From Swiss-Prot:
Pfam families per UniProt: MFS_1 (PF07690)
Membrane topology listed for this record: Multi-pass membrane protein
Sequence similarity: Belongs to the SLC43A transporter (TC 2.A.1.44) family.
Protein's name according to its UniProt entry: Large neutral amino acids transporter small subunit 4
Functional note: Uniporter that mediates the transport of the stereospecific L-phenylalanine, L-methionine and L-branched-chain amino acids, between the extracellular space and the cytoplasm and may control the transepithelial (re)absorption of neutral amino acid in kidney and small intestine. The transport activity is mediated through facilitated diffusion and is sodium ions-, chloride ions- and pH-independent.
Activity regulation remarks: Affinity and transport activity are regulated by a phosphorylation switch state at Ser-274 and Ser-297; increasing of affinity and amino acid transport activity via dephosphorylation at Ser-274 and phosphorylation at Ser-297.
InterPro entries: MFS (IPR011701), MFS_trans_sf (IPR036259)
Phosphoserine carried by residues: S274, S278, S297
Residue segments, region Disordered: 395-415
Top-rank taxon, per record: Eukaryota
Keywords assigned: Amino-acid transport, Cell membrane, Glycoprotein, Membrane, Phosphoprotein, Transmembrane, Transmembrane helix, Transport
GO process terms (BP): isoleucine transport; L-leucine transport; methionine transport; neutral amino acid transport; phenylalanine transport
Length: 568
């Protein structure tokens, strides 16, 4: 039986810790494609596309066919060639596309029904994907096509795990961006899982046995979700900010009543006790003229709450807002840059070392180990997003408390402006690192690629954490899943360009990634548009805040108080 929200809140630390481990081992493991590619080629997936070059063993140096046949090699007794690389890279493209594109329907479903069912489905799909890869490895000459279905299920299941874990930070208040970054860090660090599996594989463990055990471990994720995750969506922090701090355990429930729920109750009671049948402003004026000192209806409450209702933008308004559109540009460019490098990394390394497979395997393992940096670096960007938020004025603060300490109120920062300032710094820093990564990719030096690995890992953890923190700061929590899913879908569609870029590198450019990297470096400059706009947006908010303060001063002079409350 599913636990209640109150029970889940008491278990939030257990759920957060297990979610980090589960994301690390079962979410976006497909990002460790470099190591998986070596194991798939060693197991013979699509090896039948390669032709044995026995009839041209003694071809002279001047023969035109020799370069084509030199690309055929053997891995663990199976043939390996360019045609095999292109087919497996296509499978990776499909899987990585679903890893991001599926988030839009997932977000819509999760916003409506909560994360529990999606997480159960995701863990089941991950287990099935492992079993399909194991089954395909039993007879690769006939079952290699299963890798497409397996990677698609792997991407879908992994994103279900990742996306549902992003709702957990709602239970941690002002630390939400930090916990979002931690979840995304574990998601990004899951690229270390396949390199870890490859180490076990290199020690002689059976590839099929490894995958079967992995599928069984996914069942533990299913059980953990079944016993600990509630059916209801986790309430957003904006609801918790307006919590009425009274526990109604004597009424049979121990959770707090949110501001929205409290307003609904007040509205219902007020309408029942209202002396009139009309709730319009005319009735309000009549009540005032009759000299009523106590207004039991909620006319004034509704009038005063109208600005708050209009302040919450509609979904379409959020979709076409400049912040979302510019974040889409930033994510599309960054996602294409990162996905292309992951998909083509083995071939880029082979170009640098002239085909030495041992060196390629070593550097692939180094890349995999460095993915653990995401667990350390992703919370950094979350900390930047949460910087000084505790020093900001609380919108849910009682008016009496604000009047009691006017001097202290002046010293506090505006929360919305501080969030925008933090997001500006986060995106500017992330894009600087992305440009630095593009520069290191242009230099054909093998040891320097370790720096490229580090920058790639940091940027991958930073960009998702920054976007998640920005959406959590700017948009309502009820739209967080849908907007994040829309962003992931569009960036995944744009990242499909990595397949033609890969074909161009392997074909006309003969394996040289220079010109592809130059083009991607130029395009990555578009990422600076978002922080520049956020600077302008922050100045606009500062001007609005100044006008509001001037209005408050005027209201104070006229009424003797700055509190603009409903008449009761």
């Amino acid at each position: 039986m599913a636990p209640t929200l109150a029970t889940a809140h008491r278990r939030r630390w257990w759920m957060a810790c297990t979610a980090v481990v589960e994301n690390l081992l079962f979410s976006a493991v497909l990002l460790g494609w470099g190591s998986l590619l070596i194991m798939l080629k060693s197991e013979g997936f699509y090896s039948y596309l390669c032709t044995e070059p026995e009839n041209v063993t003694n071809v002279t140096v001047g023969a035109t066919a020799e370069p084509e046949h030199e690309e055929v090699s053997r891995m663990n007794g199976w043939l390996s060639c360019k045609a095999q690389d292109e087919m497996l890279n296509l499978a990776f493209t499909v899987g990585s596309f679903l890893l991001s594109a599926i988030t839009l329907p997932l977000g819509i479903v999760m916003d409506k029904y909560g994360p529990r069912k999606l997480r159960l489905l995701g863990s089941a799909c991950f287990a099935v994907s492992c079993l399909l890869i194991a089954y395909g490895a039993s007879n690769p000459n006939s079952l290699s096509v299963l890798i497409f279905i397996a990677l698609a299920l792997n991407g879908f299941g992994g994103m279900c795990m990742t996306f549902t874990s992003l709702t957990l930070p709602n239970m941690f208040g002002d630390l939400r961006s930090t916990f979002i970054a931690l979840m995304i860090g574990s998601y990004a660090s899951s690229a270390v899982t396949f390199p870890g599996v490859k180490v076990i594989y290199d020690f002689g463990a059976s590839f099929i046995v490894i995958l079967v055990v992995w599928a069984g471990c996914s069942g533990l994720v299913f059980l953990n979700c079944f016993f600990n995750w509630p059916l209801e969506p986790f309430p957003g922090p904006e609801d918790m900010d307006y919590t009425v701090k009274i526990k109604f355990s004597w009424l049979g429930f121990d959770h707090k009543i949110t501001g929205k729920q409290f307003y609904k109750q007040v509205t219902t009671v007020g309408r029942r006790l209202s002396v009139g049948s009309s709730m319009r402003s005319a009735k309000e004026q009549a009540a005032l003229q009759e000299g009523h000192k106590l207004c039991l209806s909620t006319v004034d409450l509704e009038v005063k709450c109208q600005p708050d209702a209009t302040a919450a933008p509609s979904f379409m308004h959020s979709v076409f807002s400049p912040i979302l559109l510019l974040s889409l540009v930033t994510m599309c460019v960054t996602q294409l840059r990162l996905i292309f490098y992951m998909g083509a990394m083995n071939n880029i390394l082979q170009f640098l070392v002239s085909g030495d497979q041992a060196v390629v395997s070593l550097y692939t393992s180094i890349f995999g180990v460095l993915q653990l940096l995401c667990l350390l670096t992703a919370p950094v960007i979350g900390y930047i997003m949460d910087w000084r938020l505790k020093e900001c004025e609380d919108a849910s603060e009682e008016p009496e408390e604000k009047d009691a300490n006017p001097g202290e109120k002046k010293k506090k920062r505006d929360r919305q402006i501080q969030k925008i300032t933090n997001a500006t710094r986060a995106f500017a820093f992330t894009n600087l690192l992305l440009v630095g990564f593009g520069v290191t990719c242009l230099i054909p030096n093998l040891p320097l690629q370790i720096l490229s690995f580090i920058l790639h890992t940091i940027v991958r953890g930073f960009i998702h954490s920054a976007v998640g923190g920005l959406y959590a700061a700017v948009y309502p929590s009820t739209q967080f899943g849908s907007l994040t899913g829309l962003q992931s879908l569009i960036s995944a569609l744009f990242a499909l360009l990595q397949q033609p870029l890969f074909l161009a590198m392997m074909g006309p450019l003969q394996g040289d990634p220079l010109w592809v990297n130059v083009g991607l470096l130029v395009v990555s400059m578009l990422g600076f548009c978002l922080p520049l706009y956020l600077i302008c947006y922050r100045r606009q908010l500062e001007r609005q805040l100044e006008r509001k303060r001037e209005d408050d001063k005027l209201f104070l002079k006229l009424n003797g108080s700055s509190n603009q409350e409903a008449f009761v």
